[in-house]
Amino acid sequence: MFLRPKHIMLSALQRFRLGACAVLCVWLLAACALEPADDTPADSKPTANDDRLLILCEGLWGMNNASLSLLDHGVLTNHWFRQQNPGERLGDTANDILQVNDTLIAISVNWSNIVQYIRPDGTAIAATENIPNNRRMATDHRGYLYVTSYADHGYVAKIDLTTKLVVDTCHVGYEPEGIAYYDGRLYVANTGGYSTQTQDHGYEQIISVVDAQTMRELRRIDTGCKNLYGKVAQWREWLCINAAGDMYNTPPHTVVLNMASEEFRVFDFPSTYCCAAQGRFYCLGSAYSHLTGKYTFSTHTIALPSLSASEGLAGYSAAEPTIASMQSPYALYISPRSAHMYASDARAYATNGYVYEFSPTGTLLNRYLLRGVNPSVFVAL
């Protein structure tokens, strides 16, 4: 594991919670502290592979600068959404992107309070505009999209993808985050992340199980782990959930849930940035402590179905020194086509980020400079 001092790291969630004071700070930061990164060339030549990936950049909260980049067979196109939709912006603080089917991609744009829909060629076609403070998404591949929302004490919205209208909702725990669909049920990880601001509830440690058809909460699974924050990773019936802890005396953990049996196992390391590939969960953990003022990063692999955990990124160990050298690791992804690993570096959280590409053995192939801030989610086309 490796450490980062407090003064160079600030998570997107912490920025989001700073309220009105943060708006002023972000504007000052954007005006005064942006590094002159736009003219920096990519570090290596394009790599010939079969990957065609979208890279979602959150942007800065309140700055309306979320963006989408296309990495097509090793060739990077920045501001791809704006290129395909002249005069349009993606919005403010994009949290998630999901390919619903062969013709439709959904993007959750949190502070714009919309779910934006685009075709695989990038052209915008519609939006759902009445889900405030939307976060993460899942689909049943049967014509419905499910979106978590921090609003109204926490709920899940069900969208009919034919009409793009919300047709039902279900209240779950406070500040629901990650969501997954399995066998007619939704599994929703609740964080309770606003607890330190609102003072009316604590951190959540439950997974809500929701009937996707009736949109009624069936039961709650108590994981015993606080603050189930972040995007979940799914491999068939297995779900990997990060539990961030309280950043004081309760350390972070990882919860792996078998959605078929609803049994789970807890691991004593975080999985802040996690992906599923080749029957494994690959976990890049980021643990912040208010007591030390430092972030601790770690890498682990969880094999399925044995649930055996090991340190490092199995098969990609050669990539670990590069990831350890990143200023602010922010996303991890393995292509289902090429088995290439991609990792992003948000750097100072207010500058253009980098994406690193590694071979199936972890050899560094490319470093791409994005024209976007906080690259957080990849999706393969």
Task: Specify the residue positions occupied by each region the protein language model found.
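Bacterial N-terminal signal peptides that target proteins for export
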Residues: F2-C21
